[in-house]
Curated annotation (Swiss-Prot):
Pathway: Cofactor biosynthesis; coenzyme A biosynthesis; CoA from (R)-pantothenate: step 1/5. This is Type III pantothenate kinase. Belongs to the type III pantothenate kinase family. The keyword Secreted does not apply. The gene is coaX. Catalyzes the phosphorylation of pantothenate (Pan), the first step in CoA biosynthesis.
Length: 273
């Protein structure tokens, strides 16, 4: 199964397989989202990258999409259908009743499907209260209690968003590369911004996980994901990093939702019209 996570920073493509009966996923490639690209342009690009990754049309029996960029959802879905002959299923609130996590109102009305996928993957893995930290365009924290209820979400500016904002919102601060410095005391402007933004985010993550545990009233497992989570891979005494968490969640969800309950326009193999 082809898994697609359409986000604000990247469109991530992965493929699902099984290992000893367990769901496993492999990221294939990432694209920069571009609303100016046509369906045909996306189709040619996705086809070429799938071929390069060794994934032919015969391997794409089904496709499952999460998207938080509505303007791209149909374009990407139709591009995949054009290549594979399979109309992707687009994950949405229609599937929430069939998940191992529960989503109460008003969270249900606004939570992104990527965060739901994260919560599903984490809860299936830990089977206990957990906090998922996603380091993407936004820095998000999703808290799930021991019964599988999503208690809430916190959203802060992401790392790249923060450095871009400092650059565009000031007269002299440069656009600095993202890196984790050893010290919080910068010796030049680049180091100072990296210390404040990247190492500062590290402290925010630790503090927010601790506060989530306090508000949930229990110790929680924690996991870090997102395209920029790699910046913290050298940290000790830090939650594990799982860059494939969102794709893993989509794979679990795709297996859990009965085909008979899929919206007619998104049943795999339908015309999609």
């Amino acid at each position: 199964m082809l898994l697609i996570d359409v986000g604000n920073s990247h469109v991530v493509f992965g493929i699902q397989g099984e290992n000893g009966g367990r769901v496993c996923v492999r990221e294939l490639f990432r694209l920069a989202p571009d609303a100016r690209k046509t369906q045909d342009e996306y189709s040619l690009l996705i086809h070429a990258l799938c071929e390069r990754a060794g994934v032919g049309r015969a391997s794409l029996r089904d496709a499952f999409i999460s998207s938080v960029v509505p303007v791209l959802t149909k374009t990407v879905a139709d591009a995949v259908a054009q290549i594979s002959g399979v109309q992707p299923v687009v994950f949405g609130p229609w599937a929430y009743e069939h998940l191992p996590v529960r989503i109460p109102e008003p969270v249900r009305a606004e939570i992104g499907t990527d965060l739901v996928a994260n919560a599903v993957a984490a809860y299936v893995h830990f089977r206990s209260a957990c906090v998922v930290v996603d380091c993407g365009t936004a820095l998000t924290f999703t808290a799930v209690d021991g019964t599988g209820l999503i208690q809430g979400v916190a959203i802060a500016p992401g790392l790249r968003t923060a450095v871009q904002s400092l650059h565009t919102g000031t007269a002299q601060l440069p656009l600095v590369p993202l890196a984790l410095p050893d010290s919080v005391l910068g010796k030049d402007t680049t180091h100072a911004v990296q210390a404040g933004v990247v190492r500062g985010t590290l402290f925010v993550i630790r503090a927010m996980i601790a506060q989530c545990q306090k508000e949930l009233g229990c110790r929680c497992a924690a996991v870090i994901t997102g395209g920029l989570s790699r910046l913290f891979s050298s940290e000790v005494d830090f939650p594990p990093i799982d860059a494939q968490l969102t794709l893993s969640g989509l794979a679990h969800i795709a297996r859990l939702v009965p085909t008979s309950l899929l919206p007619p326009a998104t049943v795999s193999g339908s015309s999609g019209n």
